[in-house]
UniProtKB/Swiss-Prot annotation:
Part of the 50S ribosomal subunit. This is Large ribosomal subunit protein uL6. GO terms for molecular function: rRNA binding; structural constituent of ribosome. GO terms for cellular component: cytosolic large ribosomal subunit. Transmembrane segments: none annotated. The keyword rRNA-binding applies. This protein binds to the 23S rRNA, and is important in its secondary structure. It is located near the subunit interface in the base of the L7/L12 stalk, and near the tRNA binding site of the peptidyltransferase center. The gene is rplF. Belongs to the universal ribosomal protein uL6 family. InterPro entries: Ribosomal_uL6-like, Ribosomal_uL6-like_a/b-dom_sf, Ribosomal_uL6_a/b-dom, Ribosomal_uL6_bac-type, Ribosomal_uL6_CS.
Amino acid sequence: MSRIGKKILEIPAGVTITVAEDNTVTVKGPKGELTRTFNADMLIKIEENTLTVERPSEQKEHRALHGTTRALIGNMVEGVTEGFARGLELVGVGYRAQKQGDKLVLSVGYSHPVEMTPEAGLEVEVPAPTKIVIKGIDKQRVGEFAANIRAVRAPEPYKGKGIRYEGEVVRRKEGKTAK
């Protein structure tokens, strides 16, 4: 039995959730609105200020979707109330980030600066030249944009230079040893 799927989701004050006929869930809150369509087999019920997700059978596919559906709706509720943020650090001599208008410009050792434009709904902050913070209400889009930034110059294992997530531990390798 899915423990996450069985958990009842408390709907906080100021958040409204609507479920359409085709299992499209719309969550409105103080920070914005998110909409997502879920598998038609899952039963999403709203009673007063709680939401429950039920599965029709014990088939492997339904068991897998049960917890996933509950977790995704939980993330939608958290996004419209608190929002999500993902931090990145730039490690390396001369590695810098700066914001020019709505673009993020990265100087990470290439012959040219790398320009990235966040999609609508995402906010990029550069509190320091070596720190980047991505904020938004959709957890998946925040994480995806952070991963795209990290992929520009992923941390290398010898010196640890590159763009890493805040708090990420880069596994280091030893260099060659002389004979």
